[in-house]
Amino acid sequence: MKKSLLVEGDGGPLSMVVAAANVPDATLLEATLDAVVLERPPAEPPDWTQHLSLDAGFDDDPSYLAALDRDYTPHIASHRTPPPPPERRFPARRWVVERTLAWLHRWRGILIRWERKAANYLGLLQFACALLWFRRLHRLTNGSPQSYVR
């Protein structure tokens, strides 16, 4: 089973898609970008674009075109060219997605899939994403993340 997750810069989940393990990454990327639950803010200034960081598994033309079709500037780690020297590399951004997946995997029902139907599992994932947003909102408005009972 594959889980495809789109997060904002601080790790807040924006969309989640589950699929069989044999689904190509480009197809899953298109579904993930189309499943965003919030409208994107208008570009200010007009030439401003949103960036999409992807790992080397998405280094193909369909993934690149899927990002461009949805007005993202893709940043895809490349298999095609050698990596630049360390002083010219951009900072890593993929860890934000990995951290959000680690937050989601704290729940046993998500780490190990017990549900037979994919729709039930997706609902559980979406509920967990909503809890992540609730915890974040609670922390931002009340201060301490430990001030409520788990």
What kind of feature is each model-predicted range?
Residues 17-42:
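Active-site beta-loop-alpha junctions of metal-dependent nucleic acid enzymes
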Residues 22, 41-118:
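Helix-centered, glycine/charged polyanion-binding patches within enzymatic domains
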Residues 5-6, 11, 29, 55, ...:
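Mobile genetic element proteins and their domesticated derivatives, centered on retroelements
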Residues 2-3, 117:
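A general lysine-centric signal
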Residues 123-150:
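C-terminal domain-tail junction helix/linker
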Residues 38-41, 109, 132, 136:
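Generic structural signal for secondary-structure transition and capping sites
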Residues 3-9, 17-20, 56, 78:
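Short, structured patches in soluble enzyme cores that scaffold and shape functional sites
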